Amino acid sequence: MKADLHIHSVFSDGSDSRESILQKAAAVGIKVLAFTEHDTTEGWQESIALGRRYGITVLPGVEISACNAETGKKVHILGYGFKSADAINALCRPVAEARHENSLQKIKVLQKLGYKITEADVLPYAHKYIFKKHIVRYLFESGQEDKIFGHVYHKIFHGGGPGDFGIKYVNAASAVKVITESGGKAVLAHPGQQNNFEILPELKKAGLWGIELKHPVHNAYWQKFVLQAAADYGLFCTGGSDCHGIYSEKYHAVGSNLCPAAAAEELLK
């Protein structure tokens, strides 16, 4: 059973519609899929019905932007199979709104630097909240950047540039708890990306169910660490493509990383 449990659509910072993603998933034999949008569960019930049209079981999903309260290190928490999304959205909404305001400040920085850009220019690229990827896509398509992930993205929005400022994320343990209390399963996403394995004892205590094994950033080196952590803490191993469409420097197609069967089967129970 082929399952891709980490996908982003236009509902957050992916470039493709959910129907387009489901079409691509069906074409490569995906049978189970989860839309794991950043800090929103919007449209999760409609997506389940849409998936049936393509012979795909769509699991309720989310990716919560969190952090280690002690170190401040970023921690992403995936949630699957929740029965209600109210508490999850209540936790995530301030983060989503803060990200949008952060993006508006980034636009102001660009204006001061001489770029021709307004909020109205970028809004058509966003579903509800503006992400920095929407900003740089507009700059690319308006001829002000030679590629989406160019100078603005790397030198202005990152690396200590004038538009490099972040937002306050939720406590990672709180994210795990709210997913669990909503009837779902909480998973530590791509720990190799942030190298945040040290938070596992706290997350396990909060109810962590799984850890992401198959992911574009997880080469053999990181998979070894993940497998050991899964054994040490009694966690299921999950996986997915983390597809963002054109909003990835290296394109990750739907189905390019699959969830191990044991976790997928457990989530379907």
Please name every model-derived segment.
Residues 1-74, 156-158, 164, 171-183, ...:
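An N-terminally biased module of ancient metal coordination in phosphate/nucleic-acid-related enzymes
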Residues 15, 100-104, 108, 113-196:
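Divalent metal-binding pocket/active-site signature
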Residues 20, 31, 38-105, 109-126, ...:
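Mid-domain alpha/beta scaffold segments of enzyme catalytic cores
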Residues 67-94, 137-161, 253-269:
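Active-site gating loops and adjacent loop-to-helix segments of metal-dependent hydrolytic enzymes
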Residues 115, 121, 127-138, 214, ...:
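Non-transmembrane, interaction-prone segments in cytosolic or luminal domains
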